[in-house]
Amino acid sequence: MKRRAASPAMSENEVDIAGSLFANHADSDDEVQVHKQQPADLDFGDLLDNGDGSDDGGDAAFIAKQQRSSNRKTGSLQSKSAKKSGGFQAMGLNSNLLRAISRKGFSVPTPIQRKTIPLVLERRDVVGMARTGSGKTAAFVIPMIERLKAHSARVGARAIIMSPSRELALQTLKVVKELGKGTDLKTVLLVGGDSLEEQFGLMAANPDIIIATPGRFLHLKVEMSLNLSSVRYVVFDEADRLFEMGFAAQLTEILHALPPSRQTLLFSATLPSSLVEFARAGLQEPSLIRLDAETKVSPDLESAFFSVKGGEKEGALLHILHDVIKMPLGVPEGIEEETDEQQARKRKRDSERRNRKEKPTEHSTIIFTATKHHVEYIAHLLRHAGFSVSYIYGSLDQTARKIQVDNFRRGRTNILVVTDVAARGIDIPVLANVINYDFPPQPKIFVHRVGRTARAGQRGWAYALLQGTSRPCGGRVRRMRTQRWRMQTRMNQPLRKTKWTSSPEKTNPPGDDEEAWEDEESESELEVTVTSSGKSYQGANILPRPRNLHVLHTIAPPAPAEERGVRAFNSGGTTQFVEAARDAAMDLANDDGAKAFGLPTRSKLRWDKRHSKYVARANDDDGSRGAKMIRGESGVKIAASFQSGRFDKWRRANRLGRLPGVGEAEKANLVRNFSGGGPGGAGAGHYKHRQEKAPKDADKFRDDYHVRKKRVAEAREKRIGKYKDGEGSRRELKSATDIRKARQVQEQKREKNARPAKRAKR
């Protein structure tokens, strides 16, 4: 009988028993080894018979050896799958939260999530620097849900999220609802503009998570005398905007009422010096998390610096857009302009279905200016030139700001004109060009600006217009260059022989080692300095290279792979945080009323009629203008209107006695009556019908007379509607006001009918 060929593959725990079945196994051993690989030093017969070839001589040793091999392989497979899955499974989150993350569409954590979530799960205070769109909302919502897990029957909120605006609070509420599916956590939304009475009911329903703006939350805290000793998790979202909008006093008062054992998270796009002091006072040994991509210029960035006169900036800007970037005029292709009539008639769902383009065009350009007046001027100039432009600045209305940014995100416009304050926190995923119309005064601001392009391995261009006053600032950036080009405009070529040259002392400080071509520059030339950190960018041609072009080329060492990726700086401890925050701190000048870019804004004054002098508007909130103020628990002055007694009136109107305190068990009837009544309750977006009306009086000429009569009798017995105060229409005895109103109604009916009274028959 001819022997069957061996199987080409062996299972993991397979043992060759061919030697025991065939007598001529020794003769054909070499033939078998050609087809398959034999396990080394393993004989099935010796293992079963406890032969001499076994070291430990037993089945237990063989089984243990195979189990160890299986465990090693399973462990390696799990580590590979965890690494491949992106890290959410490796963070120790519960299965319910992982399913919610998958439903949300998160597969791989963003850099800020990957660095922040493990620290938050370790109960450490964190200061995170991240722009809008980087996933920072999920970075603090995911560990919050993991920590709270389920609704607590004990009274007291356990998490507070502070947002600077109503829109951001609604966005955070949406994320909390989506990631909190499958849990019974209660979330409330407390923002200005909503009814205080409804918010009283929401707070009385014992919520677990509070999402609020500082002004309204402080109002409710003072009005309801809230005890915040149960809070364990506090988040200040967009903290730089919180301070910019004037919530410093409210935040100080809220921070004083929180327990010292809380965990505090602070997220901000930038880190001004005032925010650093707040973090030092309110956080315990915080860790600073900031992305490496926001602290250095991308190696894929190409930079060009144009030295122009003050009157040529507008022309240079149009030249860059027309001839360098090749910006198309009008509305981008594929986008149809809608009339006001169509915009009023269309539905939101139809608009989203009609235009599914969620990213800017390949010509998308952002232009940075100094003040909001420059923003309006440049936007009007570019629109007059035929470009499609969006613009935003700090004091722009929130709704208009959202519309302008949305138009640029969806590709309806190619240009976005902004200031540094307005652009803070805005994240555009794909941005081709950045133009510095007004050069920034600090290198950090320059890196923050140009860091919006050349992301994810894509090429990007950064252009800067330099004047005589801003030329020294541009010299710091030009020291990083690897190529420098100098060329002249055609209109100024005839004046080359008669031009005057500036002395080195005027343009460069003593001891500054600059080349001779910088000493020969004049204001009548258009100088272009191109900085390239990588290969030449083929997609943009600045100008044809002239013959007399002076090129200084320096080969820069390639950046390591770990530096090209996104890293994060983690600093623990107060001393380390102060040192790291000193490097990351960046104060942006106000874009409204600044005398010059980079200079602090002068205090706005108003005329005080009582004292006949000018006083600062900054002191209007401390009671100097006549408004009644009270001292809070922290010592800061807050408005006396926060203690208006509306909560006591609401409690008496709803016939509520003493509400349970922090740590006591919640009342089921109280929770059932007031939960889900507002936009942030359990039934967010739905309102419960609570109005009670008594049935109409029975009509003896109708067929359902007896049914109606029975219902009216039940309403009188239960005192529903108009029978609430007893028998009769409203009360058993009518007041003089009721009688007067009834006579007025009767007189109006008589005048309306205008019929003469019937004469008695004689």
UniProtKB/Swiss-Prot annotation:
InterPro entries named in the record: DBP10_C, DDX54/DBP10_DEAD-box_helicase, DEAD/DEAH_box_helicase_dom, DEAD_box_RNA_helicase, Helicase_ATP-bd, Helicase_C-like, P-loop_NTPase, RNA-helicase_DEAD-box_CS
Keywords: ATP-binding, Helicase, Hydrolase, Nucleotide-binding, Nucleus, Ribosome biogenesis, RNA-binding, rRNA processing
Compositionally biased tracts (Acidic residues): 511-523
Top-level EC class as recorded in UniProt: hydrolase
UniProt cross-references to Gene3D superfamilies, sorted A to Z: P-loop containing nucleotide triphosphate hydrolases
The Helicase ATP-binding domain, residue ranges: 117-289
Record field: catalytic activity: ATP + H2O = ADP + phosphate + H(+)
Residue span of motif DEAD box: 237-240
One Pfam family from the record: DEAD
GO MF annotation list: ATP binding; ATP hydrolysis activity; RNA binding; RNA helicase activity
Family statement: Belongs to the DEAD box helicase family. DDX54/DBP10 subfamily.
Function of the protein: ATP-binding RNA helicase involved in the biogenesis of 60S ribosomal subunits and is required for the normal formation of 25S and 5.8S rRNAs.
Notes concerning its domains: The Q motif is unique to and characteristic of the DEAD box family of RNA helicases and controls ATP binding and hydrolysis.
Record's protein name: ATP-dependent RNA helicase DBP10
